[in-house]
Design a protein with these regions (language model features):
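Accessory nucleic-acid engagement/destabilization modules that flank
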Residues: 3-259
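C-terminal helicase lobe and adjacent C-terminal extensions/tails of nucleic-acid helicase motors
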Residues: 126-127, 132, 458, 517-532, ...
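Conserved helicase motor
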Residues: 369-381, 540-543, 561-577, 592-598
């Protein structure tokens, strides 16, 4: 008998090497974490890790899988580099080839491998808990797919499945596999039938089901953590050329932001508002040092008071404090920082601030990643090392960087998901410092569910959360939240009551819903009376905003008019935002837009008109008015357009109107000063919490998690509504767009290998999507429904019929037969 295993796992490596590398990577990942003993003891986690590592690919020891992989070697690795050529030639003889080819043709399931390992591992699990055994079974069984609902169908083998597993077991090279596991003190069962009856029959499921629902989220989180740990290691062996970057996190200089501020702005505040910014910054730093052991922190400040830099500094301070605590406990854990924003449109803006900070203090490339659907991957990690494409993907999508800037969607769909790709990064939530900027953008129906899970992440993984908002952090209720501007809330209120930049005028709103014609008349009157003022008009619907823009453009030929909405190409939106920031001095600036300007777009105008929306959106709109307090008194004028508020949750609109009515009663007039905003926001937060106290959606989601219904959790937790009746349309209107489209077509037509094509498209995607806009179905003729391309192209001759470069889709609609157009 040979003294080493000849089994093969991939076309370029033996199974023994693959398992050894998965062991090495998963050990590094786990050892970098501090996990609370209430979750699992270090000994338990280490043992479960090794069981998963050494049995997840046991099914590759079957003759069926070995034949499949050797067949692939002849196609992909004909020189047989890195593997035993004699073994391959022996295995691939004519008789074996014919017999195995026929068996696989009759039943392709014989070539699968995950399920067999899921059952064989049961002979090495020490615990009697049937629920734990089911979790470990599920993790191995689904490590090449997505987690399934824990159910009778998932855990009870039907006769056909049992027959396949027994046939696979009969054709495993167990003597060879024992060479791999003998040094680890694991064993293989003597026979398979008993295992399948014990852990794949009705009695097993009855015992598992008696453990459901669980008391809390622990089993749900245990499944996600172990699944993520195995995925990170399994994929890491295939995607990483070197292992040095695994588990490595950088401890940022606690004085980094202070040093940046000194170089960027100087030491003396230049404007009155700068004094408030500096006071808030210092108070937050002081208070986070006093409260290092709190799960939830809040930075509640008015818009324009430097929340971003203050939050970055708070995270760096907390990272240093926690790293010191872990070191005192004998560990080497350094928390990652994950900065989450509600919209992709502001990720680059905030990441650029971080890059400036890192650059000013001499931090090289490789410490920061942007992770969202429009982002490219960084080319380096620490120490300026060059990364391959697969390494870039691994580190970025796995949140392996010391600082990741991402979206709420990426964060929350890592927790409320069953998807393999999303869950790979779950383990890096452990010990992380997570900043949620503009946290109020999480839909109210998810508040309680998110609160429960965030608390569980702290309880088991010591994860910390910093909520940044200009409104009260009503996401968390009834739990300890340290307000970093002032734990007593006295100074927090003072930051708001001391503001006098703007006033909220409710007079127009109190007139009731107005037609667009009536509103345009009001807008025009105001503009003519204030020719020295800039105007921002925010409407809720694209169609309405387009109509208002066109009419105001006609009425104000000498003004500088700009239009923004989701109907405008991203490349053009960026250009227009820069124009708005730097307007001509000799023209009145008028900007008409939808709520896209609420997404952290840093613009500043004198008078803002806002269509009725939930109060947090009104707050965001107010943040676009007289931000630095240098223009006298800015005005935010609320109005209500006919059918305009229909895009929002009716409950939120009702609460907003009730809160504003009470504000009018308190003030005795229809103009609310900025100093009253804190009280209004407090009132709104209390109303929101009261309304969602009996949230059925929360109860249902928690019930699914306690019953380990992973598919149901994934299918029902959606931050972004899927617009199934929308088209992705590429507007090919210029030389730059045409070059990008040609590159896209070339990839589709010429790159045959699906992995190479996927990688080439990913690299092109950020540039491609700058010229893509989502069209409502009715904005294009029905003939386009037959276009099978995921992206429809409108070229220079076609797009003018359906798309206007100024205002986007909608003005050239052609109603279908028996249909009217309404966008």
């Amino acid at each position: 008998m040979s003294s080493y295993s000849k089994l093969i796992s991939h076309p370029d490596r033996p199974l023994s090497r693959h398992l050894s590398e998965v062991d090495n990577i998963s050990s590094k990942v786990l050892s970098a974490k501090y996990i609370q003993p209430s979750f699992a003891s270090p000994d338990q986690l280490e043992y479960w890790r090794r069981v998963l590592v050494y049995f997840h690919d046991f099914g590759k020891s079957t003759a069926f899988f070995q034949y499949k992989i050797i067949k692939a070697i002849h196609e992909e690795n004909p020189r047989k580099e890195g593997i035993d050529a004699a073994y391959i030639d022996h295995f691939y003889n004519k008789n074996a080839r014919f017999e195995l080819e026929e068996a696989l043709a009759n039943n392709s399931m014989l070539g699968s491998h995950a399920q067999l390992g899921a059952y064989v591992q049961q002979s090495n699990i020490r615990e009697d808990s049937m629920l734990l055994r089911a979790i470990l079974l599920e993790v191995v069984k689904r490590h090449h797919g997505n987690l399934k609902n824990f159910s009778e169908d998932e855990f009870m083998l039907d006769p056909e499945q049992e027959e396949v597993l027994l046939e696979q077991w009969g054709r495993t090279d167990r003597e060879d596999y024992r060479l791999i596991i003998e040094a680890i003190a694991f064993n293989l069962p003597d026979e398979m039938g008993t295992l399948l009856r014990s852990y794949g029959g009705p009695r097993f499921w009855r015992k598992v089901s008696r453990s459901l629902p669980t008391e809390d989220a622990h089993p749900y989180l245990l499944t996600l953590f172990l699944f993520s740990l195995l995925l990170a290691a399994d994929k890491g062996d295939m995607m990483l050329q070197a292992r040095e970057g695994i588990g490595r996190v950088h401890l940022f200089d606690s004085g980094a932001v202070a040093g940046f501020k000194l170089q960027e702005f100087g030491g003396i505040p230049a404007k009155p508002i700068d004094h408030l910014r500096e006071k808030a910054y210092q108070m937050v730093e002081e208070n986070i040092r006093k409260h290092p052991d709190t799960p939830f922190y809040s930075i509640t400040l008015p818009t324009g008071l430097g929340k971003t830099l203050t939050a970055f500094n708070a995270a760096f301070q907390l990272q240093n404090l926690l790293a010191k605590q872990y070191k005192e406990k004998g560990g080497a854990t350094i928390p990652r920082i994950i900065y989450c924003l509600p919209f992709t449109s502001v990720i680059d803006q905030n990441a650029q601030v971080l890059e400036k900070i890192f650059d000013r203090i001499g931090i090289k490339d490789g410490y920061l990643a942007r992770h969202h659907y429009l982002s490219d991957w960084p080319g380096r990690k620490e120490d300026n090392e060059e990364l391959s494409d697969s390494e870039k993907e691994y580190f970025t999508e796995g949140w392996e960087y010391p600082f990741t800037v991402t979206t709420f969607v990426q964060l929350l769909e890592t927790i409320f998901s069953n998807r393999n790709r999303k869950l790979r990064k779950f383990h890096n939530l452990a010990n992380a410092i997570i900043i949620l900027d503009e946290v109020q953008n999480i839909p109210a129906k998810y508040f309680e569910t998110v609160e429960v899970m965030f608390q569980a992440l702290y309880d088991y993984f010591n994860t910390r959360f910093i909520f940044v908002t200009a409104t009260q952090p009503f996401l968390i209720s009834g739990r300890e939240v340290a307000e970093l501007t002032d734990p007593t809330h006295t100074q927090t209120r003072a930051f708001f009551t001391g503001m006098d930049r703007i006033r909220l005028d409710l007079s127009l709103w109190k007139e009731g819903a107005l037609s667009l014609e009536a509103l345009i008349l009001r807008f025009q009157e105001a503009m003519e009376a204030n020719r020295d003022k800039s105007f921002l008009i925010i409407l809720n619907k694209v169609k309405a905003s387009q109509q208002v823009f066109r009419e105001l453009e006609r009425l104000n030929p000498d003004a500088e008019l700009e239009y923004l909405s989701a109907a405008v190409l991203p490349v053009l939106r960026r250009e227009r935002i820069e124009k708005i920031k730097n307007p001509p001095e000799d023209k009145q600036l008028i900007v008409v837009t939808t709520q896209v300007v609420e997404a952290g777009v840093d613009i500043d105008l004198d008078i803002v008109y806002r269509d009725l929306a939930p109060l947090d959106s009104i707050n965001q709109s107010a943040g676009r008015c007289n931000r630095n307090g240098l223009k006298g008194k800015g005005e935010v004028r609320l109005f209500k357009s006919e059918k305009g508020s229909g895009i929002y949750d009716k409950v939120l609109i009702h609460i907003t109107e009730a809160v504003l009515d009470r504000a009018i009663e308190r003030s005795g007039g229809r103009v609310i000063p900025e100093s009253d905003f804190f009280t209004i926001n407090e009132d709104y937060a209390k109303e929101i919490r009261a309304k969602i106290a009996d949230n059925n959606a929360h109860s249902q989601m928690i019930d699914w998690m306690k019953n380990l219904q992973f598919e149901k959790v994934n299918d029902n937790f959606k931050l972004i509504k899927q617009h199934l009746n929308h088209y992705s349309v590429f507007i090919d209107y210029c030389e730059a767009s045409h070059g990008i489209w040609q590159a896209y077509e070339q990839i589709i037509k010429e790159v045959k290998d699906r992995w190479e094509r996927k990688d080439a498209l990913r690299k092109l995607r950020p540039r491609l999507l700058q010229y893509v806009v989502q069209f409502p179905q009715k904005a294009l003729p029905s003939s386009y429904e037959e276009d099978e391309n995921p992206i429809i192209r409108l070229d220079k001759t076609t797009y003018p019929r359906y798309y206007d470069l100024k205002t986007g889709y909608g003005l050239f609609e052609q109603p279908r037969e028996n249909e009217s157009v309404n966008i």
